[in-house]
């Protein structure tokens, strides 16, 4: 529940920044332009500074966005994902047939742009990913290299010829990772239920504990972004 609220808050502020750069600044500049054409003589210092800085930010943002989108088209590729359909979250989706009352399972096919694996450990692309997050620009998913090493079984043999294969292995293991962890937690609960209460102090030391490292948290974030139910 806490993770869901945190993801919603993160998305909220992402769209706030996106609205500032893509909507608010352009509206301010448009209103000032209309005000000028209306015949008002606005020669004050504050007005001129506001006009200049608003125009400068818009030009800078537009230029950066065009450069980044061109870079994304070269350095990333589209990957198709099949997401499970969740009735409680998807009632606002318009369907051509009745999926809500059907007993069989349904899936939604989506596409995501993912940076090629060769850029995962590049400091430049890590900074680009953070810059896009700050500016509210939708960027391809950058899979951290430590996750690729853990889930893709990569050592030092990543090349342009085999990165597609490693991406497939990484995404497959990324999808299965949470299930394996949940199985471990369920096994722990079964051990606790079947154990004698008098011997809990001895058995607790034998129950496998799931320790969430920073890598595990990053894996959960990627799972939420790529495989979360629609």
Swiss-Prot record:
Ranges of biased composition (kind: Basic and acidic residues)? 191-201
- Give the positions annotated as glycosylation sites: 41, 86, 157, 168, 182
* Main location per the UniProt record: membrane
Q: Where is region (Disordered) located?
A: 178-205
What is the protein's membrane topology class?
A: Multi-pass membrane protein
- Cell compartments where the protein resides: Membrane
Question: Keywords for this entry?
Answer: Coiled coil, Glycoprotein, Membrane, Transmembrane, Transmembrane helix
What segments bear the compositional bias annotation Acidic residues?
180-190
Give the coiled coil ranges. 172-196
Q: Which residues cross the membrane?
A: 19-39, 55-75
Q: Where does the record locate the signal sequence feature?
A: none
An annotated GO cellular component of this protein is: membrane
- Keyword Signal recorded: no
The identity of this protein, by name, is: Uncharacterized protein R455
């Amino acid at each position: 529940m806490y993770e869901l609220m945190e993801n919603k808050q993160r998305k909220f502020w992402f769209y706030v920044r996106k609205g500032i750069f893509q909507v608010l600044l352009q509206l301010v500049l448009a209103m000032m332009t209309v005000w000028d054409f209306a015949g008002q003589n606005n020669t004050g210092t504050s007005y001129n500074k506001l006009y200049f800085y608003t125009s400068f930010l818009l030009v800078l943002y537009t230029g950066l966005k065009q450069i980044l989108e061109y870079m994304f088209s070269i350095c990333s590729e589209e990957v198709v994902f099949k997401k499970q359909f969740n009735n409680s979250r998807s009632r606002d989706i318009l369907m051509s047939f009745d999926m809500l009352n059907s007993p069989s399972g349904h899936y939604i096919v989506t596409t995501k742009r993912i940076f090629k694996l060769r850029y995962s450990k590049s400091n430049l692309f890590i900074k680009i990913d953070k810059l896009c997050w700050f500016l509210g620009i939708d960027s391809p998913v950058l899979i951290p290299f430590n996750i690729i090493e853990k889930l893709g079984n990569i050592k030092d043999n990543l090349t342009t010829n085999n990165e597609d294969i490693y991406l497939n292995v990484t995404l497959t293991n990324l999808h299965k990772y949470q299930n394996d962890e949940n199985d471990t937690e369920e096994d722990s609960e079964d051990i606790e239920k079947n154990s004698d209460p008098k011997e809990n102090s001895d058995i607790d030391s034998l129950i496998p504990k799931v320790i969430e490292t920073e890598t595990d948290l990053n894996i959960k974030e990627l799972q939420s972004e790529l495989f979360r139910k629609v």
